[in-house]
Design a protein with these regions (language model features):
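Short, Lys/Arg-rich, polar N-terminal cytosolic tail immediately upstream
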Residues: 1-21
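A structural signal for multi-pass alpha-helical bundles of membrane permease subunits
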Residues: 8, 18, 27-296
Length: 296
């Protein structure tokens, strides 16, 4: 006869229960705080979408209407075909200078970062420290001298001030790419040098393919900055035919008064490409930001 031995469950004591309850409480509190913070960011965007679908007489109703009645998709057609907001021309201008400046800052920052990360020369660390120190200087401080310089060059009224400076790199982008390059094994560069490759060949054929996630981070950061830049185009561009999308929105709301439902539709149309860009590049974006901080 076989004897069955039952294993009695150990009683749950207060000493075991308290840490579990505390862990669940902390987790619940964390999610509650994160939900509130997320709502602070999501609700304005939701209001933007809702307002873009309302008729004008429902924009400022009290209490506010969260569901438009009727839903007017026609607002987008009116906004994007309005003479005050020539969307296709504004989009073309924005893509031109934002795209060119993005290519310039990615290549120049990567080249400078390669020098700081992979080359040994006298004063390298001092120069890198000076480069980082430039991030401490607010851009508004240099606004007037920069404008005077660009006017002396004859660049005011052209896209040059919005593109050419970015071909000289940027301190934050250089730092980000340098940190990523420090994670690349030195053996790859040494093997290429043994085979007779020069530094430019190593940079172009070995280093750039290996740092694609970080390059994408720099490209996305700068493209979003250039897309949303308001002050630069406002200062340096004179003709309305050269305006980007953000200045088009500004002219849209001041030329015929503020028609909020159409302005919100135009604003969402301007914002939507950046949202799509971020979600498409999200995986590489997070990878680049994470790996760039592995080694200092």
């Amino acid at each position: 006869m076989t004897q069955q031995i039952r294993q009695q469950p150990s009683p749950v004591t207060n000493s075991n229960l308290y840490p579990r309850l505390r862990k669940h409480f902390v987790m619940l509190l964390t999610y509650a705080i994160l939900t509130i913070i997320a709502a602070l960011f999501v609700i304005p965007f939701m209001w933007l979408v809702i307002t873009s679908l309302k008729p004008l007489n429902q924009v400022f109703t009290d209490p506010p209407r969260w569901i438009p009645d009727p839903i007017l998709w026609q607002n987008y057609v009116e906004a994007l075909t309005s003479p005050a907001f020539p969307f296709l021309r504004l989009l073309r201008n924005t893509l031109f200078y934002a795209g060119v400046s993005t290519v310039g800052i990615v290549l120049s920052s990567a080249l400078v970062a390669y020098g700081f990360a992979r080359l040994e020369f006298s004063g390298r660390d001092v120069l890198f420290g000076i480069t980082l120190a430039t991030m401490m200087l607010p851009g508004i401080v240099t606004l007037i001298p920069t404008y005077v310089l660009f006017r002396w060059f004859g660049w005011v009224g052209t896209y040059a001030p919005l593109m050419v400076p970015h071909f000289l790199g940027g301190a934050f982008n250089i730092f980000l790419l340098r940190q990523f390059m420090l994670t690349i094994p030195w053996e790859l560069s040494d093997a290429a040098r043994v085979d007779g490759a020069g530094e430019l060949i190593i940079f172009w054929r070995i280093m750039l393919p290996l740092i694609k996630p970080a390059l994408l981070v720099v490209a996305v950061f700068h493209f979003m900055f250039a897309w949303n830049d308001f002050l630069g185009p406002l200062i340096y561009l004179d003709e309305a035919t050269e305006y980007p999308l953000v200045l088009g929105l500004y002219a849209f709301q001041t030329r015929f008064g503020i028609q909020w439902h159409l302005l919100m539709a135009a604003t969402l149309s301007v914002t939507f490409p950046l949202i799509v860009l971020f979600f498409v590049a999200q995986r590489y974006f997070i990878e680049g930001v994470t790996l760039s901080g592995l080694k200092g």
